[in-house]
Design a protein with these regions (language model features):
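Extracellular ectodomain segments of secreted/surface proteins
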Residues: 268-296, 352-375
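Short proline/glycine-enriched turn/loop motifs at strand-loop junctions of beta-rich domains
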Residues: 307-313, 376-384
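Bacterial N-terminal signal peptides that target proteins for export
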Residues: 1-12
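Bacterial N-terminal signal peptides
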Residues: 11-23
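Extracellular interaction modules
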Residues: 12, 251-254, 259-267, 332-355
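Surface-exposed interfaces of beta-sheet-rich extracellular modules
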Residues: 227-229, 253, 301-332
């Protein structure tokens, strides 16, 4: 007995020394692993590991497995909380449930919350819940690959690695994918239905489908793209490798971009406009064209005033000397005109030539008046007169 007590004291002394030197984390208690071969339900907090084989493990809404569930066939139905799942096992993560770390290579259905998931499979992951980070790795099969059905909910970061084999397919039908990055020679196939927005799209991504995907942040594809499913905003930063061409839609117009290095669509295909007066002594820009960049389909306006002793005739016209857009001139009155240019251009400095305003003329005083009758003969109804030199209206 005395020897046992001395041995126990020695063990305690060693533990105390380890804790003092390395802290309590250095002392690890290995929990028991529970083998599950028949359908089982967990309804309490449990820090043990579970090994599930060809059966169903259900974690109820009050259940919380803080350890790891290893799978070899069978199904996990989670209504509560699980720390980690690893292995070949189907996972049904229901609404209100959570999984911290999911490492599975069989079918996954998520309507709850998953912090991190790594999916190396030829099966299907269907999401209508929330996944912070989803990593999809192609195991290298040439005839099958993983499928991600994005029906609703959110995936903040979706990362695909595929160097060989069939491309993983991402069916984007609903919800929000914030970022998609595809690494590897083959990359991923993104099939879009409906209209969606994504902040970042990078790597080898083949976009197709019947919908429109608008990239609002960063668009950086490794290959060219000539489809009709990609859109951008004025704030999208594009990078296109030399030798590649991508087509993007902005404001219902398609642009072909052949080279770009972290540039916005306004820098790559934007337009400017200016008006050049033939004789600046005859008019003044009350509201000139702004110096901003305009895109195809947008309109720029300006207002010009005739100077004193000048006016704009009713048939006043201006000419677009550089540009393919349309120019509309509205004569507000004899002193003021409005210019409206609608761009049908890309990467063009539009120029508009403004002819000089017309000088006003003064009628000679009438001659040959007799008998004190002060009138002018020969006046017709087509003639107009102004009440003063500065009058804006004619009668």
């Amino acid at each position: 007995m005395e020897k046992r007590i001395r041995a126990l004291k020695a063990i305690i002394l060693v533990v105390v020394m380890i804790v003092e030197l390395f802290g309590v984390d250095a002392v690890r208690v290995v929990a028991e692993t529970i083998n599950v071969t028949g359908d089982t339900t967990i309804s309490t907090e449990d820090n043990r590991d579970y090994a599930v084989t060809d059966c169903t493990l259900t974690v109820s809404s009050t259940g919380n497995i803080t350890g790891t569930v290893f799978g070899s066939g069978g199904t996990i139905v989670n209504q509560g909380s699980i720390g980690k799942i690893d292995g070949n096992i189907k996972v049904d993560n229901q609404a209100g449930a959570s999984i911290q770390d999911l490492q599975s290579s069989v079918d996954i259905t998520n309507a709850g919350y998953i912090t991190s998931a790594t999916y190396s499979s030829t099966y299907t992951l269907t999401n209508s819940g929330t996944i912070d980070t989803l990593n999809v790795n192609n195991p290298g099969f040439s005839d099958s690959a993983a499928t991600v059905n994005m029906n609703a909910g959110t995936i903040s970061s979706l990362n695909v690695k595929n160097h060989t084999g069939t491309n993983p397919v991402i069916n984007y039908a609903g919800g929000t994918i914030t970022s998609l990055t595809a690494e590897g020679t083959n990359g991923a196939d993104l099939v879009v239905s409906g209209s969606h927005e994504i902040s970042q799209l990078k790597g080898t991504v083949n976009v197709s489908g019947s919908g429109m995907l608008t990239v609002s942040g960063v668009l950086q594809l490794e290959k060219g793209y000539t489809g009709e499913n990609l859109g951008v905003t004025k704030d999208t930063v594009l990078t296109v490798k030399d030798g590649n061409t991508i087509k993007v839609n902005y404001n219902d117009h398609t642009y072909s971009i052949s080279s770009a290095t972290e540039q916005k669509i306004t820098e790559l295909a934007g337009n400017t406009v200016k008006a050049v007066m033939d004789d600046a002594a005859t008019m003044t820009a009350e509201t000139p064209f702004t110096l901003e960049t305009y895109m195809y389909g947008e309109q720029a306006t300006a207002v010009y005033m005739a100077n004193d002793d000048y006016y704009f005739p009713e048939d006043y016209t201006a000419t677009v000397t550089v540009g393919r857009g349309t120019l509309d001139i509205t004569r507000i009155n004899a002193k003021k005109i409005n210019l409206a240019y609608t761009f049908k251009d890309e990467n063009t400095g539009v120029e508009i030539s403004l002819p000089a305003a017309t000088a006003k003329t003064t009628q000679d005083a009438p001659t040959g008046l007799t008998g004190g009758i002060e009138k002018v003969t020969g006046v017709t109804t087509a003639m107009e007169y102004a009440g003063s030199k500065t009058s804006d209206t004619w009668t």
